[in-house]
């Protein structure tokens, strides 16, 4: 699991992806960034 996802941050989806290793790899699920 990566950092928490903040709905106020419009870059969050990209940050989650980056944390998980690339585009489309991360998914914000509620307050958590989950990696596929």
Swiss-Prot record:
InterPro entries: Scorpion_toxin-like_sf, Scorpion_toxinS_Cl_inh. It comes from the Eukaryota. GO terms for molecular function: chloride channel regulator activity; peptidase inhibitor activity; toxin activity. Disulfide bonds join 2-19, 5-28, 16-33, 20-35. GO terms for cellular component: extracellular region. Keywords: Chloride channel impairing toxin, Disulfide bond, Ion channel impairing toxin, Knottin, Metalloenzyme inhibitor, Metalloprotease inhibitor, Neurotoxin, Protease inhibitor, Secreted, Toxin, Voltage-gated chloride channel impairing toxin. The keyword DNA repair does not apply. It is found in: Secreted. Expressed by the venom gland. Is under several clinical trials (phase I, II and III) as BLZ-100 (Tozuleristide) by Blaze Bioscience Inc. as a fluorescent imaging agent that labels tumor tissue (CNS, oral cavity squamous cells, breast, skin) to enable more complete and precise surgical resection. BLZ-100 is composed of the chlorotoxin peptide covalently congujated to a derivative of the fluorescent dye indocyanine green. This toxin binds to the surface of glioma cells, and inhibits their proliferation without having effects on normal brain cells. In this context, this toxin has been described as a chloride channel inhibitor (probably ClC-3/CLCN3) by causing its internalization via caveolae. It has also been described to selectively interact with MMP2 (in complex with MT1-MMP (MMP14) and TIMP2), to inhibit its enzymatic activity and to decrease its presence at the cell surface. The presence of a 'disulfide through disulfide knot' structurally defines this protein as a knottin. Negative results: does not interact with MMP-1, MMP-3 and MMP-9. Was tested in clinical trial under the name TM-601 for treatment of malignant glioma. Belongs to the short scorpion toxin superfamily. Chloride channel inhibitor family. This is Chlorotoxin. It comes from Leiurus quinquestriatus quinquestriatus. The lineage of its organism: Eukaryota, Metazoa, Ecdysozoa, Arthropoda, Chelicerata.
